[in-house]
């Protein structure tokens, strides 16, 4: 399903997904350091591979995608297909509702 067909996201459900599937490598807390993956604070509207102080793969820098709801929706389906060569080992979220929920949470938590 494309982003245009995505269900509305539930940020509470998205927070649970973040805690179980993302938080071991990422944080959303402003001013917190990077973990294995970059801090996601300020994610929306930022270009991939540009968070200060994090060592990105050339793939993430060269892809130069602007993170927004649609790009995250596509990326989170299959990160390695969307950015071949990414360091992110997460296989993705296959269910449209899970992606919509996670994005709703990230929109609130990273602002």
UniProtKB/Swiss-Prot annotation:
Post-translational modification comment from the UniProt entry: Binds 1 heme c group covalently per subunit.
Annotated keywords: Acetylation, Electron transport, Heme, Iron, Metal-binding, Methylation, Mitochondrion, Respiratory chain, Transport
Domain of life per record: Eukaryota
Cited InterPro entries: Cyt_c-like_dom, Cyt_c-like_dom_sf, Cyt_c_1A/1B
Coiled-coil segments on the chain, per record: none
Residues binding heme c: 22, 25-26, 88
Main location: mitochondrion
Free-text function comment from the UniProt entry: Electron carrier protein. The oxidized form of the cytochrome c heme group can accept an electron from the heme group of the cytochrome c1 subunit of cytochrome reductase. Cytochrome c then transfers this electron to the cytochrome oxidase complex, the final protein carrier in the mitochondrial electron-transport chain.
Name used for this protein in its record: Cytochrome c
């Amino acid at each position: 399903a494309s982003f245009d067909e995505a269900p509305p996201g539930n940020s509470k459900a998205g927070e649970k997904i973040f805690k179980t599937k993302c938080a071991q490598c990422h944080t959303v807390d402003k001013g917190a350091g990077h973990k294995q993956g970059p801090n996601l604070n300020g994610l929306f509207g930022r270009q991939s591979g540009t968070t200060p102080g994090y060592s990105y793969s050339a793939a993430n820098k060269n892809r130069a995608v602007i993170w927004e709801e649609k790009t995250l929706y596509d990326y989170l389906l299959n990160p390695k297909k969307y950015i071949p060569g990414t360091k992110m080992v997460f296989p993705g979220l296959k269910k449209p509702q899970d992606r919509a929920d996670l994005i709703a949470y990230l929109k609130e938590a990273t602002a």
